[in-house]
Curated annotation (Swiss-Prot):
Database matches in Pfam families: OTCace, OTCace_N
Keywords of this entry: Pyrimidine biosynthesis, Transferase
GO biological process, one term: amino acid metabolic process
E.C. number(s) listed in UniProt: 2.1.3.2
GO annotation, cellular component aspect: cytosol
Binding site for L-aspartate: K77, R160, R211
Encoding gene (name): pyrB
Subunit structure: Heterododecamer (2C3:3R2) of six catalytic PyrB chains organized as two trimers (C3), and six regulatory PyrI chains organized as three dimers (R2).
Binding-site residues for carbamoyl phosphate, renumbered to this chain: R49, T50, R99, H127, Q130, A252, P253
Reactions listed under catalytic activity: carbamoyl phosphate + L-aspartate = N-carbamoyl-L-aspartate + phosphate + H(+)
Protein's UniProt name: Aspartate carbamoyltransferase catalytic subunit
Keyword set includes Zinc-finger: no
Primary role: Catalyzes the condensation of carbamoyl phosphate and aspartate to form carbamoyl aspartate and inorganic phosphate, the committed step in the de novo pyrimidine nucleotide biosynthesis pathway.
Length: 304
């Protein structure tokens, strides 16, 4: 049963195969379920890109989508997450996509349910499909990971994107640097080295900006965000000093003129909307891996 909970569970070869499948889907290869198959999407946190790209991926694969609303479900009556998943399994769901505010919510489920769990983000912990779409975007741009220098900039402490990407990119041979305000550093994330943003600007191949997660902070004021942009954001002046051929990435949603100058969101270096497009293809590949009996299995030459 091919669940996807964290990037640490994937080998380089497994990452390679997922990316190759995603690239095939991006190039127009089609794959349809061979029988009626239900997949349930459970989002306990707000989401636009992840939720809808999973739904588009499911529908493009010919899967039947069950969209779960916590507000109108028995969760409001005290039903546990485990009982909810077992209920969906009992009525015919063959896989579940879950986003949850609790770090590692899946620990209580993974050895108890009989259908694959696809983690769409757990608290401040992991975001494997975001990581995979970022890897696909980088691979399309540079053709490799080995030897690339990548800066992950912003709220490292609260970012599941930073955690998943730093681990996976290190595994694939890239060098990771972090740039962050002191209070948002995460000393438990040992996959990168902290340096100042202005030192990194002319050196790195990828500038990966992180959203300031105001919902996880006590203070979110205009003057504080203006100060953040000046000290830690990608300003127009900083973009002008970036390395030739380097790219800008952001998992979105973007706080314009906070993490990045509004004018740069769709500039020549930006791959922000390309990342979103790649999210559909990566999630198609992840679903195909999770449901081999109805979506088939393909082996590929290594893509890493």
């Amino acid at each position: 049963m091919s669940q996807l909970l964290t990037m640490s569970e994937l080998s380089k070869e497994e990452i390679s195969e997922i990316l190759k499948d995603a690239e095939d889907f991006a190039n127009g290869k089609e794959r349809k379920a061979t029988e009626q198959t239900f997949v349930a999407n459970l989002f306990f946190e707000n989401s636009t890109r992840t939720r809808f790209s999973f739904e588009v991926a499911e529908k493009r694969l010919g899967l039947e989508v069950l969209n779960f609303s916590a507000d109108s479900s028995s969760v409001q009556k005290g039903e546990t997450l485990y009982d909810t998943i077992r209920t969906l399994e009992s009525i015919g769901a063959k896989a579940v996509v879950i986003r949850h505010q609790q770090d590692r919510y899946f620990d209580e489920l993974k050895d108890k349910v009989n259908i694959p769990i696809l983690n769409a983000g757990d608290g401040c912990g992991n975001h494997p499909t975001q990581c995979l779409l970022d890897l696909l975007t980088i691979k399309q741009e540079f053709g490799r990971f080995e030897g690339l220098k990548i800066a992950i900039v912003g709220d490292i402490r609260h970012s599941r994107v930073a955690r998943s990407n730093a681990e996976a990119l290190t595994k694939l041979g890239a060098t990771i640097y972090f740039a962050s305000p002191e209070e948002w550093k995460d000393e438990t994330n040992t996959f990168g080295t902290y340096r100042s943003l202005d030192e990194l600007i002319p050196e790195v191949d990828v500038m990966m900006l992180l959203r300031v997660q105001h919902e996880r902070h006590d203070h979110y004021e205009t003057d504080i965000m203006k100060e953040y942009h000046e000290n830690h954001g990608l300003t127009m002046e900083r973009e002008e000093r970036m390395k030739e051929g380097s790219i800008i990435m952001h998992p979105a949603p973007v706080n314009r003129d906070v993490e990045i100058a509004s004018e740069l969101v769709e500039c020549k270096r930006s791959r922000i909307f390309k990342q979103m497009e790649n999210g559909v293809y990566v999630r198609m590949a992840v679903l195909k891996r999770a449901l081999p009996n109805v979506l088939g299995g393909m082996k590929h030459e290594l893509f890493v």
